């Protein structure tokens, strides 16, 4: 939503306002039940890093991030473009939560396939995201980074490990 907006200053203000509401009001109402997860201005990794630190000061240690930022028109994970973002997450012990489909792109077999096919192969987004991460310098540069691949299940993990071992 905010990534595509023309007024980036207003968008950044909206991100901060959303995080304040989400952390303080929504999750703050039931702190033993809800875990807040911040959003960040993905169009600027330095602004994103600042928002991660600001959210951490409020007690929020999880942040959403696209499983494939390149599909959103942003630089890919293999570039140092994202270093300020990942450095901030490591610095304040914030988990990077990569949600499947957050790149606005899901794996499809064919345009005429029923929705059931897409639902069944959704974990492939997690498989693709993990493989992309493994071959980036991110995990070496930021060895204490914590990453969560959300809603992809675990059935694909043995296959992913086997592929990584023999690639």
Ranges and model annotations:
Residues 1, 23-28:
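Catalytic pocket of metal/acid-base enzymes, prominently hydrolases
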Residues 1-3, 114-115:
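A short small-residue
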